Amino acid sequence: MTVTPHVGGPLEELLERSGRFFTPGEFSADLRTVTRRGGREGDVFYRDRWSHDKVVRSTHGVNCTGSCSWKIYVKDGIITWETQQTDYPSVGPDRPEYEPRGCPRGASFSWYSYSPTRVRYPYARGVLVEMYREAKTRLGDPVLAWADIQADPERRRRYQQARGKGGLVRVSWAEASEMVAAAHVHTIKTYGPDRVAGFSPIPAMSMVSHAAGSRFVELIGGVMTSFYDWYADLPVASPQVFGDQTDVPESGDWWDASYLVMWGSNVPITRTPDAHWMAEARYRGAKVVVVSPDYADNTKFADEWVRCAAGTDTALAMAMGHVILSECYVRNQVPFFVDYVRRYTDLPFLIKLEKRGDLLVPGKFLTAADIGEESENAAFKPALLDELTNTVVVPQGSLGFRFGEDGVGKWNLDLGSVVPALSVEMDKAVNGDRSAELVTLPSFDTIDGHGETVSRGVPVRRAGKHLVCTVFDLMLAHYGVARAGLPGEWPTGYHDRTQQNTPAWQESITGVPAAQAIRFAKEFARNATESGGRSMIIMGGGICHWFHSDVMYRSVLALLMLTGSMGRNGGGWAHYVGQEKVRPLTGWQTMAMATDWSRPPRQVPGASYWYAHTDQWRYDGYGADKLASPVGRGRFAGKHTMDLLTSATAMGWSPFYPQFDRSSLDVADEARAAGRDVGDYVAEQLAQHKLKLSITDPDNPVNWPRVLTVWRANLIGSSGKGGEYFLRHLLGTDSNVQSDPPTDGVHPRDVVWDSDIPEGKLDLIMSIDFRMTSTTLVSDVVLPAATWYEKSDLSSTDMHPYVHSFSPAIDPPWETRSDFDAFAAIARAFSALAKRHLGTRTDVVLTALQHDTPDEMAYPDGTERDWLATGEVPVPGRTMSKLTVVERDYTAIYDKWLTLGPLIDQFGMTTKGYTVHPFREVSELAANFGVMNSGVAVGRPAITTAKRMADVILALSGTCNGRLAVEGFLELEKRTGQRLAHLAEGSEERRITYADTQARPVPVITSPEWSGSESGGRRYAPFTINIEHLKPFHTLTGRMHFYLAHDWVEELGEQLPVYRPPLDMARLFNQPELGPTDDGLGLTVRYLTPHSKWSFHSTYQDNLYMLSLSRGGPTMWMSPGDAAKINVRDNDWVEAVNANGIYVCRAIVSHRMPEGVVFVYHVQERTVDTPRTETNGKRGGNHNALTRVRIKPSHLAGGYGQHAFAFNYLGPTGNQRDEVTVVRRRSQEVRY
């Protein structure tokens, strides 16, 4: 029997029983239970806080690449908070799921809805409003009022100099729209439409909002400036190697990798919603390697850290290539690799060797024309050597087969019975025509980066009258991989430090031990062999933002191509910098570029545009030949970068606007008055210098941009490299530029140099935003935008296969409007004013020679023919830009903006070279939306709401409309002769609508708009269609390229990947040498601006939650060693100064940082905790105050193969990683 222990006695029992009289509640008989009622009033607050009336699906349009679906909670008409959606479709068994997706930044967005930074009403610059109202009262016409202000230099300078100094006043939507419309009408009437520009980046992050504004700009004949290249997020190597902008795997494909490298991409920070795939791949057994100069957040996830000095990654990749070529191609041959490069790369193709003085140097591809073939497009059909027959043959699939009747059914990678020989060494030496020759190659591994040469032997043979070798032969010579019997300077082994591209050579440059580089290369290759190419490299801004990023990327891509990893699930490259992938591509570009109403659109590379119009070119005092190869032809001798930009514009390689030194509308009138064909008239006038390209005199007031609209962007506070030059020259307000244009440097020969440098080119800068930023603060008109929780829109990304919706959880509060509604108001006001001042005009539109068109064959061999230099009469579309005459009915802009135009019925829609015809879709849209019943748009489908525009974008895109996907593949089948339509068959009746995206995340359809397959739920990987279905790459050979044969690439010595160190800022720009300054108070360091943990670009960096989680305000990360040199302790105020500007911030001293490098995270705006400087007493700048735009000539190459312009496909990058700055400790007493 169990005895219950008894504690206490009668006294205790008495106390227990008495206690019930003093304790609230009801007691049980045994006193063991007390029941209390009430007292929970405090819970009401908690329950009320988390109660809500409805939940709405939306996402964030912040260019974070996440495109995460969120639940937005609303109570009493107020947005209260957000949480992650959890209804993503399953990716299948045996792999992790996509959900939940999100990050702390996204989870804090609702703070913005009611924050102090919210733009609630339309604003305009007070002094300008006063001028405008007075002039309008006096003249009675908005356009005349605007013209009156611009005609008075004193009044114009008054409001320009007020930019950024406060003084914004509330105005009505009607007055703001009228003022903006008047500025547009006046500019078009006086100067021409190409003096109007729009800047809005990353359409994938909110397609409707982007298209609404871009559509207006293009309909009036204005210019859309690019962003992908301007941000330096575009890896120019992608068009150079693949002929593709950037197509990359979704993050779910990382799971399939068995060797995963993060090279210049800090995945946990910049790809937070997707980082779990990286960790899970490692748990699955993949080895994870990180290449970075600092101990970054992703380093702690890695199995191995390869600590490579900043900006020297090319040297490491070249050394790894040396090992892979030695181990897998020369000492042994890995059949998997050899078979791959024979079919899918240009390694077997023949290169002509040419004499240059006493030297033998690599030249251009041997083509069918060189060996006497007279077939169509013979000059664009490169040749190779058939190993079986020992004869030179012309394989199918090259550019010459892509266009023209002879190529129908032959543009494919089917080699038939041909076995491409990788080397002429495989030749059987018929008639003794095989021998070896010394070829001279460039090298740039000196400290200052100037070129030297190395001579190495290659096996050669004759092909007709030409001495040739293969690309592979040149690769081995260039990488320093010796073969028996070949003369020249060769490494004695991996540990030879004296010869370029060996592991020991790279150690002295990168700091990576030679043994580690050798093991890294061997592991990478061995894994590819054993796994069938499942070696993957995630790449990003860490190596993409450098001046020489193209060769840096090409050297890394070479590793993937040599190991057969491209075009494989779980293998290849994975470049992520920016939310670039507009999955419904065709529909978006039709809407955004207004090609349903007028063609072609005006598009310009952003870096070229801002380089010229912010006068940053004037501060470049070095000759372009400083970058040239020692074995070049001297094409850049004595030329300034601006001369090369002028030549590229003249030859039609790269566009620039404005076009002419007078209005393009007036030029059309002149040609008509002369009774001449417009093309002939323009060419003749240009040759006689009676008409000039504006690029030859960009500082002449007639050639200035006059009106700039910025929306969905923060140009001045985020992406404006050389921000202080924007302020000084474009906007005409105060700046902190610390230098003057050099007087003793190289000045342009073909561009007017005037000692009077303009300040204040723009008549109007207008921005649309939901929060106050550095851009809105300098704008003349600020329109209040709806946030991402207050409008209808679409989002997609590279990272996952879904299309997401934005949905309005509430109506836009105060006087805010969606971008769609804002541009509707502006277009309506514009058309009303145009009735009196513009009417219908004829416009002459110049457009660069385009990628994915026959324009790629304009310049055989990529040989420049500069009519500006020779005095010849240019030929439009051949030796200069294409010329198109466009009729613009300016009175009907609003009606056209609001409807789907007839050109898609007439000409179809072309994407990446194939055309589809959406007759059925147009009829369906007309039936669903109704049609316009009057005016020029009568009978056309009405797009009167943002929801409707979203549905149009989806309906016109193969990724969201299975019928168009199948039609596109059938069209490609005719040209390729390969079966492709099966990739989308079964989807013919499938449609994705805006309502579908509101219901849940919707995966897209496999479409020829992109290079990978998603059929059957497959994880998306790029180029799988090329590899598995023999569709050629969009390049000269139809294969992936190691070798580039364009004149301007050759002049730089970059036909093959080559190590080029960071720019020598001391030699080229007279900046201080790295290290302590002469006075010992400062330290010159390399200045890098990586992406931030606490913001996406400038969004969230001013968010109260993120300011609380981070250090808050402007900061600079530096190493303890560097900090000690200038007596800086953690959290001290420091000041950074260089020729471009001044930056004031607090120091974060951390052991994770290498010496000689500082990080200022992108973006830290001037709107948070930015004090005055000690240098000049003005307020300090932002992270871009210390940067400046520099143009690399090879990025301007055009008119030949994959080197041809397309918007955001190819253009100079706004690189900024080569900068240096002097940092010093400043007074800790800061003033604001």
UniProtKB/Swiss-Prot annotation:
Q: Which GO terms describe its cellular component?
A: extracellular region; membrane; nitrate reductase complex; peptidoglycan-based cell wall; plasma membrane
Positions of [4Fe-4S] cluster binding: 60, 64, 68, 103
* Record has Ribosomal protein as a keyword: no
Query: E.C. number, please?
Result: 1.7.5.1
- Please name the SMART domains in this protein's record: Molybdop_Fe4S4 (SM00926)
Q: Where in the cell is it found?
A: Cell membrane
According to the record, the protein's activity is controlled as follows: Increased nitrate reductase activity is seen under hypoxic conditions, however this seems to be due to induction of the probable nitrate/nitrite transporter narK2 rather than increased enzyme activity.
Induction notes from the record: Constitutively expressed; independent of nitrate and nitrate levels.
As for membrane topology, the entry says: Peripheral membrane protein
Question: What is the organism field in this record?
Answer: Mycobacterium tuberculosis (strain ATCC 25618 / H37Rv)
Query: Deletion: any effect?
Result: Loss of nitrate reductase activity in aerobic and hypoxic conditions.
Residues with the N-acetylthreonine modification? 2
The GO molecular function terms of this record are: 4 iron, 4 sulfur cluster binding; metal ion binding; molybdopterin cofactor binding; nitrate reductase (quinone) activity; nitrate reductase activity
Kindly provide the name given to this protein in its UniProt entry. Nitrate reductase alpha subunit
The UniProt record lists the 4Fe-4S Mo/W bis-MGD-type domain at 53-117
A further note on this protein reads: One of the activities induced in M.tuberculosis by hypoxia is the dissimilatory reduction of nitrate to nitrite, which serves to provide energy as the bacteria adapt to anaerobiosis.
Query: Entry's NCBIfam families?
Result: narG
